[in-house]
Amino acid sequence: MKITKLEKKKRLYLMELDNGDKCYITEDTIVRFMLSRDKVISEEELKEIQDFAQFSYGKNLALYHLSFKARTEKEVREYLKKYDINENIVSQVIANLKEEKWINDSQYAYAIINANQLSGDKGPYVLTQKLAQKGISKSTIEEILNDFDFSEVAQRVANKLLKKYEGKLPARALQDKIIQNLTNKGFSYFDAKIAFDELDSQVDEETTQELIFKELDKQYTKYARKYEGYELKQRLTQVLARKGYDFSDIASALREYL
């Protein structure tokens, strides 16, 4: 077979043969096989050219995708599949990129976790979930997590939460709110409780009284329309307890209020 045309088409070249066959190849393919118009190639050589062209095209696509930011093996593999590249060729491209250090799931996971240590607010459980979604193996994630201490991150988040809710919630509700937020962000209950216990979060009696009477004003208006006497007192006690107030504070406030 003889090459009758080599024509540049954007990022690829169109190669036509005298038997009517056509295929798109990369510039790397032309250089590797020293292709030119009128060159004669065999069926075997054509197969090698086509395979390498797919590999070269896939690698170029992957490198373009990686040029914007680091990606995991799973992300690159899924990106290449959009271009209908043969699965075997995709695996070859991935293996080549890993060998050349363009893809390294361990480094990717380390970078994400380390960035979180410096300025993030996520605990190990959420990070594990996010990294697993990127295709990183559980064993790789666990190995890297073992190198980090999340107590400082938990403390940083707890301090921010304290600033947000202090003076707005009674002591028990404040504790519940901060611990719940920490566990939602991926910290264990144990670590969340330690972070809370290290806060300077004393809610003084005057603040508690102010908060409880403010809440009573709102709830009394709501329940006094339907209840009175003992039933009203019970309803108010229940709603205040759900809001996080201690029963002793509730009883004291109701004695003054009713």
UniProtKB/Swiss-Prot annotation:
Alphabetized InterPro entries for the sequence: RecX_HTH_1st, RecX_HTH_2nd, RecX_HTH_3rd, Regulatory_RecX, WH-like_DNA-bd_sf
One GO BP: regulation of DNA repair
Keywords attached to this entry: Cytoplasm
Highest taxon of the lineage: Bacteria
Compartments, record wording: Cytoplasm
GO cellular component: cytoplasm
Protein's UniProt keywords contain Cytoplasm: yes
Record-stated family: Belongs to the RecX family.
Role, per record: Modulates RecA activity.
Protein name: Regulatory protein RecX
Species the sequence originates in: Streptococcus pneumoniae serotype 4 (strain ATCC BAA-334 / TIGR4)
Gene it is expressed from: recX
